[in-house]
């Protein structure tokens, strides 16, 4: 089976620090290659893969301001689709622009919808349902107006996240610094529980960062560390009493949630979006509806078995399970 894996070009694949879509694309690509699938990864030219790397984009546009996102996204797409007939299947991880090319080629295409942002994007999904096989990353993120080939939860390489059986007394926030992700709520919950909070993530909303994070960050009770990747990411996720994920939107998935649990860290999350699909209340974390409930949950974290947190990820959110699910979908589409 020859698969063209179309990665986004906002960040390198795999990302150096931040880049959840690129991370999932890389994890799936490498797992498929390990299973003997002939995968060509179409990504930025600084990307890395055990498969075949192909591309025309010199660098990620979020890292290099000289790269015009719109120009190079379409150049990226054109480069792949010009050679579509070389492949049995195209797997699009790069959002809806690729759909404009789908009707122009005979090669079947899978699109992983990494988050259905609003009804405004439906015009780039509904007309292509007979040509593109859509995959949701959670049942919560399925849109009622679309047909889906499957729901496939993300998976991670659990061995990349060392188990910490103890953690610490401190709390953790891990995500974009943006109102959606609830940094302000995490700060409020940490203060109310009188525990230190460590925040990690890229600043996506500068005004919000200046209003909510900067005044609170005294490097004693609240510390902002910026974005981290690799071993530093795993170390941060494991060395906490709990991850506070008090989101203000219906998040389609949450990689940091399952990464934290893989390290043994329980997650206290808002009971919305995909969180009830990831968190089993009282087993690997707690689902809450307010900051007050989060504060109460912080005091109950001792009831959670950190080994059970890791086991829940091993059973449900491994990269092997994700790769097997996608491979089964590919075979079903191709009639193999």
Model-predicted segments: where are they?
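Catalytic cores of nucleotide-sugar-dependent glycosyltransferases that transfer UDP/GDP/TDP-activated
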Residues: 1-336
């Amino acid at each position: 089976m020859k698969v063209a894996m179309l990665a986004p070009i906002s960040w390198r694949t795999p990302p150096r620090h931040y880049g959840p879509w690129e991370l999932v694309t890389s994890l799936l690509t490498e797992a498929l290659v390990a299973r003997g699938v002939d995968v060509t990864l179409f990504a930025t030219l600084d990307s890395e893969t055990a498969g075949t790397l192909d591309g025309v984009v010199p660098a990620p546009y979020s890292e290099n301001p000289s790269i015009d996102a719109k120009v190079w996204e379409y150049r990226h797409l054109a480069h792949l689709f010009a050679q579509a007939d070389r492949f049995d299947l195209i797997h699009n991880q790069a959002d809806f622009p690729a759909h404009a090319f789908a009707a122009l080629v005979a090669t079947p295409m899978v699109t992983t919808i990494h988050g259905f942002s609003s009804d405004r994007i439906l015009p780039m999904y509904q007309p292509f349902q007979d040509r593109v096989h859509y995959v949701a990353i959670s049942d919560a993120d399925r849109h009622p107006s679309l047909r889906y080939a499957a729901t496939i939860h993300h998976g991670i390489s659990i061995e990349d996240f060392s188990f910490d059986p103890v953690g610490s007394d401190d709390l953790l926030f891990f995500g974009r610094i943006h109102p959606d992700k609830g940094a302000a709520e995490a700060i409020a919950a940490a203060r109310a529980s009188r525990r230190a909070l460590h925040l990690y993530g890229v600043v996506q909303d500068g005004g919000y960062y200046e209003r909510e994070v900067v005044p609170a960050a005294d490097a004693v009770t609240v510390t902002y560390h910026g974005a981290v990747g690799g071993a530093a990411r795993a170390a941060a996720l494991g060395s906490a009493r709990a991850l506070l994920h008090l989101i203000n939107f219906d998040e389609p998935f949450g990689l940091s949630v399952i990464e934290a649990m893989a390290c043994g860290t329980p997650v206290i999350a808002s009971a919305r979006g995909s969180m009830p699909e990831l968190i089993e209340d009282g087993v690997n974390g707690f689902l809450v509806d307010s900051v007050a409930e989060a504060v109460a949950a912080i005091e109950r974290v001792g009831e959670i078995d950190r080994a059970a947190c890791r086991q829940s990820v091993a059973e449900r959110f491994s990269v092997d399970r994700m790769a097997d699910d996608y491979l089964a979908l590919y075979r079903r589409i191709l009639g193999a």
